[in-house]
A protein has these predicted regions:
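A gly/proline- and charged-residue-enriched helix-loop-helix capping module
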Residues: 90-124
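N-terminal basic, low-complexity leaders that serve as flexible interaction/assembly modules and, when applicable
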Residues: 1-80, 84
Length: 124
């Protein structure tokens, strides 16, 4: 599903109308998101590639935006670094990031496959 306006913008090709997308476009206001949320947790929507893709594409279909934004959470890489992320209802870490432990946490290696669900969602 290639969008010409977006591809042209990436190629710096002049056009009469720029591509349109919004951050958090699959938000709480959107009925498509609300319907998915009644059957799935936030984490399920993010970590299931098919659900993440469906969530991201909802606003494209409803509002005719030009570009979809990956439906995910910015905190998942920190979870992969061993910080123990849970949602109840909002995000909570098992350990806090401090000046004292930041060097150790950010120098941890992690299996990049722990974030494979994000790449799989993009492929859909």
């Amino acid at each position: 599903m290639t969008n010409k306006k977006f591809v042209n913008a990436l190629g710096k090709i002049p056009q009469s109308v720029p591509p349109i997308w919004f951050m958090r476009q699959a938000g709480r206001y959107h009925s498509h998101y609300q319907n998915l949320k009644t059957k799935n947790t936030f984490v399920e929507l993010c970590k299931s590639p098919s659900l993440a893709a469906e969530t991201a594409l909802g606003p494209i279909e409803s509002f005719d935006f030009d570009v979809a934004i990956l439906f995910s959470d910015i905190l998942f890489p920190l979870e992969s670094l061993g910080m123990g992320l849970t949602y109840s209802p909002g995000p909570k870490f098992d350990q806090l990031l401090t000046e004292e432990n930041s060097h150790e946490i950010f120098n941890n290696t992690f299996d990049v496959n722990s974030l494979a669900f994000q790449g799989e969602a993009l492929e859909r």
